[in-house]
Amino acid sequence: MNTKISPLIKESLNKELKRQQSHIELIASENYVSKAVLELNGSVLTNKYAEGYPGKRYYGGCEFIDEIESLGIQTAKELFHAEHANIQPHSGSQANDAAYKALLEPKDRVVAMSLDAGGHLTHGYPINFSGYTYDFRFYGVNKDTEQLDYQEIEKIVLEHKPKLIVAGASAYSRIIDFKKFKEIADKVGAYLMVDMAHIAGLVAAGVHPNPLEYADIVTTTTHKTLRGARGGLILCKQEFAKKVDLAVFPGSQGGPLENLIAGKTQALLEASTDEFKEYGKQIVKNTKALANVLQENGLRLVAGGSDNHLINVDVKSTLRITGKKAEKILESIGIICNKNMIPFDTEKPFYTSGIRLGTPAMTTRGFKEEEFKQVGLIIVNALKDPSEENLEKLAKQVTSLCEKFPIYQNIKY
């Protein structure tokens, strides 16, 4: 059996390692996992098929797989104060798919946040499975504040009387009032589901309210702010446990990815530490430091700022460029972010009026407020003066910052 990585793959792998080491990563959904998580992702656990759940497998030889998955389930329950946890979903999208299947029948009505306001594809986007399987209606944000308007959400819910309300977003920078969502859901007898994929790490660290107190089902990814192996996680009340488990297997998936489940479990254990709590606090501090610099230099922030790990910047109104153009300018100097639609966007989704900036990855590398102030000034300088000479100068500043906070130094391929 071949024991060496193909040179066709190895070259790209080493280039990607170098890119991660030498760039400032500001994509809000990305992070740097620990060396332990990396090792588990590539462990012998990838060889094992384990359809079913601990103690109830359809394959033999699952004794040690059961030990790891059971530890992951218990850790997730304790970390988020959940009655039940399923750590098998391959992704956040599949976690959402299973949650819908547990609560709904096809064509049932759902109210969720619109994509342009900050929602996610799996919250009813027409060409996504959610949009053509269920009957979605949407709420957005207030046009003046660009924040959730709970009175307006209540009006929409009372009008459409959904079976399920989805709270949570992929590009919303303010605290979400889960208690208010629960009160609205109760007025029409609807279930409440929270997608906390972006904020799970902040919830674990205690710097964002925990939706488990109010929601019937909570879904999340295990990467992003949770800093784990890529995948999904479902947390719920005990009364929904059987339906959720059946919706995951055999409803949505076959064999679970046990190497990734081990990586998820490791990340959940890491997230249970005091060190991780400090990490979550630092994310919020860093986001506010970055936001302040951008605002002080004339950039307009959607919703007026941020309470969490991300910032949405309106580059169209302040700099007269699209999000796509801003993304390319920043990438040219080694700062990675993504173009993003903003509320009431007049640009097409491939161009957008905004960019989304996140602090989790560089906080993992050790950046604190001072470094993020420097990053903010570099961003402003690059977007206001994208001349070749200026961008070359700024690229050197990016390289210098990355060299001061190295990552994955001992990894060789």
Curated annotation (Swiss-Prot):
The keyword Transferase applies. (6S)-5,6,7,8-tetrahydrofolate binds at residues 115, 119-121. Pfam families: SHMT. GO terms for biological process: glycine biosynthetic process from serine; tetrahydrofolate interconversion. GO terms for cellular component: cytosol. CDD domains: SHMT (cd00378). GO terms for molecular function: glycine hydroxymethyltransferase activity; pyridoxal phosphate binding. The keyword Cell wall biogenesis/degradation does not apply. It is found in: Cytoplasm. NCBIfam families: PRK00011.1. The modification N6-(pyridoxal phosphate)lysine is found at residue 224. Keywords: Amino-acid biosynthesis, Cytoplasm, One-carbon metabolism, Pyridoxal phosphate, Transferase. Its cofactor is pyridoxal 5'-phosphate. Transmembrane segments: none annotated. Pathway: One-carbon metabolism; tetrahydrofolate interconversion; Amino-acid biosynthesis; glycine biosynthesis; glycine from L-serine: step 1/1. InterPro entries: PyrdxlP-dep_Trfase, PyrdxlP-dep_Trfase_major, PyrdxlP-dep_Trfase_small, Ser_HO-MeTrfase, Ser_HO-MeTrfase-like, Ser_HO-MeTrfase_PLP_BS, SHMT-like_dom. Belongs to the SHMT family. Homodimer. PROSITE patterns: SHMT (PS00096). Its EC number is 2.1.2.1. This is Serine hydroxymethyltransferase. Catalyzes the reversible interconversion of serine and glycine with tetrahydrofolate (THF) serving as the one-carbon carrier. This reaction serves as the major source of one-carbon groups required for the biosynthesis of purines, thymidylate, methionine, and other important biomolecules. Also exhibits THF-independent aldolase activity toward beta-hydroxyamino acids, producing glycine and aldehydes, via a retro-aldol mechanism. The gene is glyA. It comes from the Bacteria.
